[in-house]
Structure formats: structure tokens, C-alpha cells
């Protein structure tokens, strides 16, 4: 092949058996090789045969593809090559690889205890264009999680990592660090959609081999304790058409800020139960029992979100987690439960029903739908075909303010969202967003009008009455300059009047939010270095409503940006990973307008205030009210203890400067330094950058 050189790593499955493998498979040309050299001969011959036979598809050349195509295959007891998986976003490459392996000659199969056995292998083929033809293929072994079955004894021989969830309909838990790593592989695909999160593992495996990634991190351990601590799920059961895993969850943190608090801590213990029934149905459930006391500014913020105390004496809502009750002195007890069912009846549809969170966007923040609020019940339908991914999402939310709480029961509200993602070209993606919120008034319940997956919600808002609902629309875009660099944006429109926009008179009703950002994967040719810069802004009164129960919120938290509205914000992020070690750095700087203490006027920063209490109809500008400059810097380093459960050791420091223009007992100028260390199962992000 012209101007093309493949380097390949031929990876042998490692097995733990009561005896050593008697004989490696014998490829054509290796018949006379001594047994001790047979493995190297086999790997070299197969690698050469595959590389020399592959004709690189035009699509890869056109897209200037660079990266690995991982081929998982096995040699059966008859000596025939069988391809199990080709990890490539290009179907043409998959077809070509399967063709090549089907044409390989039969070999003498491997032997164990004098019986022919199956053996499985992974062959990652690295494809750099215009590489030096003088380079030599580098052959290495890797511990890979597969089983070798001995024919007569029925013995399963394995000491390596089995991650069955990687081939299920479960979601990869959403954290910014994990998804920034995954997205770089999505960017190499010709028809990937990255905005709707979390991703299912079946979506991810089209672009990246998670098994190979995590097996590369595996520690060689012979004891049960060592394997469970560093490599495996605590409990795993697998049958012919089902599997289950059971793992403990911990989030144990201790720290100190520069306030009068003796120390900060978080003590979370929990359990996660996951599984699959057949190939189409998967489930996950997690329960967390937690007690904690945080840095003083976080405690104050949590108490400012407190639910109606008459409904049960709840002093706080822990940001992103849920309602808390008092625990000992200046601490909180906050249980959280999450879970969902995921069902994929065919290649076009995925259905999910559960109690968790969702995210729409390509940024660190989202102006459309974020994971800032507490978990909520939802039903989601993802439909994928051609260059389209269409998401319908129905959510059951709560308003926990005392004004709407009756007999200790919180007010129920509902939200329906749909998002259309279209890959216009391989590099350009655009998205259309629409969402509506309505309350359970007049025993209205879940209004069937909003079950239509393709209706325009703004029309329904008017057809169901002036207080029928609150609709928002949005537009997104993402452009990939190449596999490593991309830019993205969001435009959110709550309300607007075209004539007033043209006049530029600061009309209050032009309520909108905007985001623009850029990502740089493997920045400056440093592998696993990720950089991101982002700007977010929302005009005053965005996401609010004259009937506050119809605002864009849940459990006294914004369903979009953490800061609500009436702000400008800049975000800079750097992530770096080396093996099991990682480091993250984040800087957030912005300006936000708060309401003035003792003043009932709404300045547009609190989405739970009635916008009819606004300052004026014109001259409305971002930062009005108690203008406050906010700076948050966060640095964290850590070590991944267990790739299967994402258990991490970490230490970090957070610095926060909060500088309001008008000082009061509620708004004080503060400089906070918060040191923290801990051990946690990293299944979600803590967002304390407010």
C-alpha cells in the first residue's frame, strides 16, 4: 500500500491455569519451530499476514484517520480464525478486516492437557499515514480478560478482568473527566453524536475498546483481596444469557477550609447493583447513605436551597444530590437513590426509565439541560438513524418552596424535552432543542399533549392556557477541525421580541443564554492532555416565570447552568492522565448579579423569583443588582485504584474569591482555601464552583 505503514501489537490473552499451556497455535511456516519460540513465530506470522492483506478503505484515507483499529478474534478447535469484534467507527474497515481474517489459512489449534482448545487474541492495528517505512512493528503482550475452556474438564481458566457492562445497554457514569477522554474517540468517527449524555456502552464500543483500555491498567494480583481491590467487581455472576455485578460505593473525604469549622468531611457508603438479561435489557441501581459537612461557603449555599422546613425540618439541599436533614453539629444527612432500566429493542431505539440525571451539550456547563440539580424520575427515548439522533425526555420534577407546599407534600411539576442532533457533514453537527414545563394544576397530572414526540411545545403552551406551561427553545452547533480540535456553542431562547432586539434598548423580555467553547485533545502532541476553554452567559430573568413553579428548576436548583441567570462566566480546564495517575485543573471566573438583601425587587439572577417583580422593562443588563465578581480555582491529583469500579484516591485544593459590590450579612467578601483528600467511587461530579 502506497504511503502507508501499519504497526501492530499482537496481544495474547493471559490465563491462570493449574498447568501451563502445552502448545501455542501453529501458523503456516512455524511447523518446524521449537516450542519455546512458537509464540513469537505465531505472532509475527499472523501480524505480517494481516497487515499485508489489508487494503485501507478510501473513507479512512479521505478522513485522514489516525489511531488504532482493535480486532478481537479467536482460533477455534478446528484451527479457524473467527473475528469477534472490530473496534472501528468505519463499517468499511470492519468489512475489510473480516474479509482478511476469513482468508487466513487454518492453523494447528492450541493445546492444553493434550486437548485442542480455543484461544482469544487482540490485534490493535495502528494506522499512521506517511509513516517511516523503516519502523519495525513492536510486539507486546497484554493481560486481557477472556476465558480459555478446556474441552473435557469444563475448566474456566481466568485471572483477568471481566467487565461485562462494556457490552451492555448500561450508561457510562457521567463525569467530565471520563467523558473528555471518551469524546476524543467519538471525534474520529464519521457519524458520531456527542451532545446527549450519558452514553450507553453499546454506543461507546463503536469508537473505543474500553476492554483494551482497562486491561492495560490491570495489576497482576494472585490473591482474592488484591484482585477485588485493584482490578475487579466485588461480586460477579454470569450465566448463559444473564449477568450481575455487586459493588460497594464509598465517598470518604476529609479536609479543612479557613473558616471556624474544625474540619470538613463526607462519609458516603453505598451499594451498586447492575446486570443484564439477554442482550437487549440492562439495569443499574445505586443507593448512597451519606453524612457530610463541607466548606463554609458550600454549607451556606446548601442551606439557602433548603426545602420547606414545615415539610420535615430539612435544613439544606446538598447541591446536585438531594434534601438533607440535620446531623450532629453543623452537618447533614442526605440519602440518595438512583437507578434505571435500559432496553434496546432494535438498532434504532434505546428506551430508558429511571431516577437519575441527564445532560445535553458539548460543554462543561450546559445552557439547555445539565446535571446540576438532584436526581429525578425520567423516561427517555433515543432514536438513531441515518445522520440523525433524536432524543425525547420526559421528567417528573418538584418545587419544594414553602409557598407551594401543602400538608407537607411538595408541589409536583413536569418537563418534556426533545433534542434533534444532525450530522450535516462529518465535521459539522447542529442540534435543535425544545423544552416545556407545566405544573400539576386542576389535577392535570402528566398532560398527554406533551407525549407527542415531534410537536412544537410553544404551540401547546398557548393552547393549554396562559398558565399552561413555560416553553424554551435552543440551537446547538459543533465543528471538528480535526480529530483533536473542536468548537461548540449553544443558544437558549426563553422569550424574545424581534423588534426590541433590533432597538438594543435592554428589553427585559429578551431572555436568552449563550455558550461558546473549544476543546483540544492530546494537546500539543502530548497524549492524554486535554484542554478546554468556555464562555457562558445568561441575561437577567432567563429561566424564570411569572408563576415561579413553572421556572426551569427542580428542588430549588437550576436545570441548566449552576449560576441560574444574570451572569457572565469564563471556564478553563486541563486534564492529564498517565496510566492510573491523573490530574485536573480548573479555573472559573465570572460576574453575577444577585438580588439586594432586604429588597423585594427581582434583579433577574434568582430563577425562583417572579419576573413581574422586575426592576424595569428597559435598560436591563447582565450583572445588575448586587454585582459580584466570583473566582474559583481547583486543582486535584489522584490515583485510580480500581478500573472496574472507578475507585480513586485523590487530594485537592480549592480557592474561591467572592467579592460582592454591596456587603451585608448575606453577602460578605470572602476568600476561601479548602484542602481535601479522600477515597471515592467516581460515579458523578461534585460541582462547587459557584
Please name every model-derived segment.
Residues 5-7, 17-147:
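Charge-biased low-complexity segments
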Residues 105-106, 248-254, 654-656:
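Generic short beta-strand segments
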Residues 63-67, 117-119, 265, 333, ...:
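Residue-level preference for beta-strand/loop junctions
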Residues 334, 428-690:
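Exposed, low-structure sequence patches enriched in small/polar residues
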Residues 149-429, 436-440, 503-512, 519, ...:
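Outer-membrane beta-barrel channel domains
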Amino acid at each position: 500500500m502506497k504511503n502507508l505503514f501499519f504497526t501492530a501489537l499482537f496481544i495474547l490473552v493471559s490465563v491462570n491455569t493449574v498447568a501451563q499451556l502445552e502448545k501455542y497455535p501453529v501458523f503456516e511456516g512455524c511447523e518446524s519451530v521449537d516450542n519455546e519460540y512458537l509464540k513469537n513465530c505465531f505472532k509475527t506470522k499472523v501480524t505480517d499476514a494481516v497487515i499485508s492483506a489489508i487494503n485501507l478503505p478510501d473513507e479512512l484515507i479521505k478522513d485522514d484517520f489516525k489511531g488504532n483499529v482493535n480486532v478481537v478474534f479467536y482460533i477455534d478447535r478446528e484451527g479457524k480464525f473467527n473475528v469477534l469484534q472490530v473496534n472501528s467507527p468505519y463499517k468499511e474497515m470492519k468489512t475489510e478486516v473480516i474479509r482478511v481474517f476469513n482468508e487466513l489459512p487454518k492453523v494447528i489449534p492450541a493445546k492444553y492437557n493434550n486437548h485442542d482448545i480455543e484461544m482469544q487474541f487482540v490485534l490493535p492495528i495502528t494506522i499512521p499515514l506517511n509513516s517511516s517505512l523503516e519502523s519495525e512493528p513492536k510486539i507486546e503482550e497484554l493481560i486481557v480478560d477472556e476465558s480459555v475452556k478446556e474441552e473435557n474438564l469444563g475448566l474456566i481458566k481466568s485471572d483477568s478482568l471481566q467487565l461485562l457492562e462494556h457490552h451492555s445497554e448500561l450508561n457510562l457514569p457521567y463525569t467530565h473527566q471520563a467523558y473528555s477522554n471518551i469524546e476524543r474517540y467519538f471525534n474520529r468517527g464519521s457519524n458520531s453524536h456527542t451532545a446527549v449524555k450519558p452514553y450507553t456502552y453499546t454506543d461507546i464500543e463503536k469508537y473505543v475498546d474500553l476492554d483494551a483500555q482497562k486491561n492495560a491498567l490491570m495489576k497482576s494480583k494472585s490473591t482474592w483481596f488484591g484482585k477485588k481491590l485493584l482490578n475487579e467487581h466485588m461480586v460477579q455472576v454470569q450465566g448463559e444469557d444473564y449477568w450481575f455485578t455487586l459493588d460497594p460505593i464509598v465517598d470518604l473525604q476529609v479536609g479543612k477550609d479557613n473558616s471556624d469549622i474544625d474540619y470538613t468531611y463526607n462519609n458516603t457508603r453505598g451499594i451498586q447493583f447492575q446486570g443484564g438479561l439477554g442482550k437487549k435489557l440492562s439495569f443499574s441501581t445505586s443507593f448512597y447513605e451519606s453524612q457530610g459537612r463541607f466548606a463554609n461557603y458550600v454549607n451556606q449555599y446548601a442551606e439557602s436551597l433548603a426545602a420547606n422546613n414545615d415539610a420535615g425540618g430539612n435544613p439544606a439541599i446538598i447541591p446536585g444530590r438531594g434534601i438533607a436533614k440535620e446531623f450532629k453539629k453543623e452537618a447533614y444527612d442526605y440519602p440518595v437513590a438512583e437507578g434505571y432500566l435500559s432496553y434496546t429493542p432494535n438498532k434504532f431505539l434505546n428506551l430508558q426509565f429511571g431516577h437519575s440525571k441527564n445532560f445535553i451539550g458539548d460543554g462543561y456547563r450546559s445552557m439547555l439541560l445539565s446535571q446540576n440539580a438532584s436526581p429525578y424520575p425520567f423516561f427517555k427515548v433515543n432514536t438513531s438513524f441515518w445522520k440523525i439522533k433524536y432524543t425525547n425526555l420526559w421528567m417528573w420534577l418538584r418545587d419544594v418552596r414553602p409557598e407551594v407546599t401543602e400538608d407537607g407534600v411538595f408541589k409536583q411539576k413536569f418537563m418534556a424535552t426533545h433534542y434533534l442532533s444532525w450530522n450535516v457533514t462529518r465535521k459539522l453537527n447542529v442540534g435543535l432543542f425544545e423544552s416545556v414545563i407545566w405544573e400539576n394544576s386542576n389535577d392535570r397530572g402528566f398532560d398527554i399533549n406533551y407525549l407527542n414526540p415531534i410537536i412544537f411545545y410553544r404551540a401547546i403552551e398557548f393552547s393549554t392556557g396562559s398558565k399552561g406551561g413555560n416553553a424554551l427553545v435552543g440551537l446547538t452547533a459543533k465543528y471538528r477541525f480535526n480529530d483533536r480540535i473542536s468548537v461548540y456553542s449553544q443558544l437558549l431562547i426563553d422569550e424574545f421580541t424581534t423588534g426590541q432586539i433590533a432597538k438594543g434598548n435592554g428589553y427585559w423580555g429578551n431572555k436568552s443564554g449563550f455558550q461558546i467553547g473549544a476543546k483540544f485533545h492530546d494537546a500539543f502532541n502530548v497524549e492524554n492532555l486535554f484542554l478546554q476553554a468556555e464562555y457562558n452567559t445568561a441575561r437577567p430573568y432567563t429561566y424564570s416565570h411569572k408563576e415561579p413553579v413553572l421556572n426551569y428548576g427542580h428542588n430549588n436548583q437550576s436545570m441548566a447552568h449552576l449560576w441560574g441567570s444574570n451572569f457572565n462566566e469564563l471556564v478553563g480546564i486541563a486534564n492529564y492522565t498517565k496510566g492510573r495517575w491523573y490530574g485536573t485543573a480548573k479555573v472559573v471566573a465570572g460576574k453575577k448579579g444577585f438580588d439586594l438583601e432586604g429588597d423585594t425587587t427581582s434583579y433577574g439572577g434568582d430563577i425562583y423569583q417572579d419576573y413581574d417583580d422586575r426592576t424595569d422593562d428597559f435598560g436591563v443588563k447582565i450583572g445588575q443588582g448586587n454585582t459580584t465578581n466570583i473566582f474559583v480555582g481547583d486543582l486535584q491529583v489522584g490515583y485510580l485504584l480500581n478500573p472496574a469500579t472507578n475507585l480513586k484516591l485523590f487530594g485537592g485544593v480549592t480557592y474561591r474569591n467572592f467579592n460582592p459590590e454591596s456587603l451585608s450579612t448575606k453577602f460578605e467578601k470572602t476568600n476561601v482555601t479548602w484542602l481535601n483528600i479522600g477515597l471515592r467511587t467516581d460515579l458523578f461530579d461534585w460541582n462547587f464552583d459557584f
